[in-house]
Amino acid sequence: MNLDLLTAISPIDGRYRGKTERLADYFSEYALIRYRIRVEIEYFIALCELPLPQLKDFDYSLFGRLRDIYLTFDEAGAARVKEIEGITNHDVKAVEYYIKEQFDAIGGLEPFKEFIHFGLTSQDINNTSVPLSLKDALCDVVVPQVEELIKQLTDYAEEWKEVPMLAKTHGQPASPTRLGKEVMVFAYRLQKQLDSLRQCELTAKFGGATGNYNAHHVAYPEYDWKAFGNKFVSEKLGLVREQWTTQISNYDCLGAVLDAVRRINTIIIDLDRDFWMYISMEYFKQKIKAGEVGSSAMPHKVNPIDFENSEGNLGVANAVLQFLAQKLPVSRLQRDLTDSTVLRNIGVPLGHTVIAIQSTLKGLRKLILNEEKISADLDNTWAVVAEAIQTILRREAYPHPYEALKALTRTNHKMTEETIHQFIKELNVSDEVKAELMAITPHNYTGI
């Protein structure tokens, strides 16, 4: 059976491939190999620039051709690496051998080939390649989609800023609010957590077999290898080098990044559920597309499927993000191999995340505001002005105002405009205060 959209096991690579395809440039096996080659090549160039004595005669004009090894790397190249891995049974060693083949193709580089992967362990490559790919994926794909969602919410908040709406706390009528303000709550929350994500450092482990530069130091004790590593990771890769490690990354900062993404996802789940409720309450209708079917049995159905799809995908994403953030920082002694297979799954929750964000955006863009229903609910819930009345009566030193309004409104009898106004007329307050109270309605008692 050939692998395609219909035979893929994961819906990320099957049903939803159209939404996640860009992530293949960062988290596929091909992408991981390309990032590994990039780190190996840049490391070799950095050794030349140092320079190590054996590399001082390397022709700097060839740096461009070296970088072309990863810049022009394609699926055929990746297939060759996998072919080599079939012999070595070691993925990073296969990358090293592939690069040596490319050096041979350039020609004249035989004296320099043994400085490919010099002094390094596999995790010096993996623990730079993975955070580098994550950094690029967040910058190029995930963050722009979150920004697009924030922009859509901000636009709606402005459009609906003057639309009064009955609030619900504990599922019951509460002091009125404005629809635009409630939408802005989500834009504000997402922006705060997006800022938090941007502040997270993406760190890398780079220090040899057990994090001490043993091989580097024994071969060239005259060099400051920590300073070299700091500069290489920062200037060549745009990451921050972890100063104290075992053979592998501490993964604490990676965990913080994943937790930051999870907080963003949690806010979107909250958004999805609220808009699902607003649609259920008929505060919004949904645009109907000709030919679409809402139910295999009930022809009339127009379901909020986009928000439901988003919520489901975010649930999967957050479960994996939480597992990754909790598992990766834990490794036996100087390392065990459990992080290796786990790291390969970083793209999975991000795939579900981008599917979800696109679904939420699709759902939002199908909304049709039903002001008539929103207004009718306000007209039907005059009890919510009780807070306003009792607060003004407190200001006027009226005796037991809260209790008076409680006795009036906390019953099983419906409160109407007439009921409220009759209560106000019977109050022992000035005509000016009565007029002030009479002016309060569920439509204008919306705060600031």
Labelled PLM ranges:
Residues M1-Y213, Y220, D224-F232, G294, ...:
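A helix-coil-helix interface module used to build multimeric assemblies
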Residues E42-L47, Y98, Q102, A137, ...:
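Generic, well-ordered alpha-helical scaffold segments in large soluble proteins
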Residues Q193, V240, T246-R332:
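Glycine-rich anion/phosphate-binding loop at the beta-strand->alpha-helix junction
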Residues E158-K161, L202, W276, Y283, ...:
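Alpha-helical coiled-coil oligomerization motifs
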